[in-house]
Amino acid sequence: MKQLILALDVMDGEKAMEIAKKVAEHVDRIKVNYPLVLSAGVGIMKRLSEIKPVIADFKIADVPYTSSLIARIAFENSAESVIVHGFVGSDTLREVCRVAEEFGGKVYAVTELSSPGGEEFMSAVSLKIVEKAKEAGCHGLIAPSTRIERLREIRKAAGDMEILCPGIGAQKGSIEAVKYADGIIVGRGIYASGNPAEEARKLRRVLKI
């Protein structure tokens, strides 16, 4: 079953909780990033996890030991899964997956960013990242809805790995991404609207998920 994932990139913990409660019946998971965690504290993930499963989008990108510590902090604070940059290489990917396994969590590797800059360096190696992520034991991938031709190639290489796609909404990603993705990540299009719950409901209908 395909999922709608809220990227909750606000910088106020109470506002985040308010939005999460409003949209809870219309989204499947909540993705948090540095803006919220750095402003509200890492404990906000525990609070949000009482509403919906939380993806810690820390885009982990360091040496294996440091990356393992970041992953551990996320899982100890009730994250269901973490996001790691795929370009860090096999050793870091394996170490993050090892920590995830301790907690029964998931790891998603970024293949390429959905922003235009993602094409400058990452597109050239994204299929190699898919290969390394598979070998390391990652559960899934992050791939762009903003470049459908790239998403098609990543889907083909990924096989049955789960793919989550950001970029629909503010970044003008294509709704065609739904064909290739297991989850669609939407942020500003939901939380910055006048009625987040209604916007999330409409998105589910439009995307047929």
UniProtKB/Swiss-Prot annotation:
Its EC number is 4.1.1.23. One of its GO terms (cellular component) is cytosol. It holds the Pfam family OMPdecase. Substrate binds at residues 9, 31, 57-66, 114, 166-176, 187-188. GO terms for biological process: 'de novo' pyrimidine nucleobase biosynthetic process; 'de novo' UMP biosynthetic process. The keyword Lyase applies. It comes from the Archaea. Pathway: Pyrimidine metabolism; UMP biosynthesis via de novo pathway; UMP from orotate: step 2/2. GO terms for molecular function: orotidine-5'-phosphate decarboxylase activity. Signal peptide: none annotated. The active site is at K59. It catalyses: orotidine 5'-phosphate + H(+) = UMP + CO2. InterPro entries: Aldolase_TIM, OMPdecase, OMPdecase_arc, OMPdeCOase_dom, RibuloseP-bd_barrel. Keywords: Decarboxylase, Lyase, Pyrimidine biosynthesis. The keyword Protein biosynthesis does not apply. Belongs to the OMP decarboxylase family. Type 1 subfamily. Catalyzes the decarboxylation of orotidine 5'-monophosphate (OMP) to uridine 5'-monophosphate (UMP). Homodimer. This is Orotidine 5'-phosphate decarboxylase. The lineage of its organism: Archaea, Methanobacteriati, Methanobacteriota, Archaeoglobi, Archaeoglobales. The gene is pyrF.
